Amino acid sequence: ENITINSQMSDTPDVDSKGQEIGQEIAQEALQTEDVNKLYLTIAESLNQADVKDATVIRGDDYTYVSFTNNVFFDANSSVLTREGQAVLYTFAKAIAPAAGGIEQVNIMSHTAKVTDNSQTDPKTIRKDRILSAMRSAEVSIYLQHQNVIKPEKLVDISYGEYRPIADNSTEEGRIKNRRIEFLLLDNGAKERDLNEYYKEFKSGEYANTTVVTVGESQSSSQGG
């Protein structure tokens, strides 16, 4: 199958106007002092209100982690951001804007799933996997840069391809979990670590009390008292 590469953002006429709107709202990043310790709640609430389901938001000691399944942003074998994906990123951008001054770096991490046994040796599959993963993280980074919510030098796009699985690739359910976009928002002064170290913290349950999985506005409302 061919990979669809997104060549430009011109098919999204509202990107620049939205970016200017958010940029005007935050004025200068240096003035943004909202407590980064509460940022995970702001993000989760915003995503719930936007009816985004199954996003995981975690607050660690010096970072905020957010994970989405790939189908939120991209169609299969495509690096073109969907309209739905752009809307989710716009919501995410507005949510992090008030705390932008307290964020040192935003890692945008793209993951794919291993679909064939020879995926790590077949030249065509290697190329497809690496390019697709890299283009997806780049497109998310480009979209966020258009929104003017954080200094562009703080946006770092990273592509892991199939090499950081969190589930079993032998099942469709596992592959769906492995195809994902993650954000690691590092606080000012935080020391970046290997991604696997963060995963170990998540699995240990250390941050269970500061972990939110979004259910969307409709379910969130129905669960109220």
What are these regions (language model features)?
Residues V36-I58, V66, F74-S110, S141, ...:
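Periplasmic peptidoglycan-binding/anchoring modules of Gram-negative envelope and division proteins
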Residues E1-D75, K191-G224:
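Juxtamembrane linker/hinge segments adjacent to a transmembrane helix in small membrane proteins
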Residues S79-R83, A99, H111-Y199, Q219-G224:
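Periplasmic OmpA-like peptidoglycan-binding domain that tethers envelope proteins to the cell wall
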